[in-house]
């Protein structure tokens, strides 16, 4: 289990844009499982949407990307590097994420070639899939 301070030793994102709270498990270069505890005080709820707060799909996707970054940047050869989006494919949003939800984030690296790769990403709450798709990344 990694806490936020340990996560910051692997990925470069910082508050308020650090979108994962803890990493349950990870295998360098292969996979990672993380959690985002969705708090009612999150900065984005002020405008998305007042009176009906919903976590934006793009931020669910970013949370998944940061989870995948833990897997790929924890490789010794990628220390002190960054993982950038190369593309988002087949991303589907199935349920809303709201304050109080515990968002489970799972990413499995399914393809790697040089600095490029693809991760299969699934976000879920209470065992129900809220989003899934493929994230292409480049390590720089």
Language-model features: locations:
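Hydrophobic beta-strand-centered segment that forms part of the acyl-chain substrate-binding groove
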Residues: 1, 68-104, 132-138
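Conserved positions in beta-strands of structured domains
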Residues: 21-24, 89, 94, 108-110
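Catalytic strand-loop segment that frames the active site of acyl-thioester-processing enzymes
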Residues: 15-55, 60
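HotDog/MaoC-like acyl-thioester-processing domains
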Residues: 29, 98-101, 108-140
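Short aromatic-glycine motifs in intrinsically disordered, low-complexity regions
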Residues: 2-14
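Active-site helix/loop of acyl-thioester processing domains in fatty-acid/polyketide metabolism
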Residues: 23, 55-78
């Amino acid at each position: 289990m990694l806490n936020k301070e340990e996560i910051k030793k692997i990925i470069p994102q910082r508050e308020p844009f650090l979108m994962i709270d803890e990493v349950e498990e990870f295998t360098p270069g292969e996979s990672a499982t993380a959690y985002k505890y969705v708090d009612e005080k999150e900065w984005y709820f002020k405008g998305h949407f007042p009176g009906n707060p919903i976590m934006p799909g793009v931020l669910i996707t970013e949370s998944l990307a940061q989870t995948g970054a833990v897997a790929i940047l924890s490789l010794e050869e990628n220390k002190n590097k960054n993982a950038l989006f190369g593309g988002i494919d087949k991303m589907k949003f199935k349920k809303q994420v709201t304050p109080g939800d515990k968002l489970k984030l799972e990413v499995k690296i399914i393809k790697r070639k040089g600095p490029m790769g693809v991760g299969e990403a699934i976000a879920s709450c209470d065992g129900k899939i809220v989003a899934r798709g493929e994230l292409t990344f480049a390590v720089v």
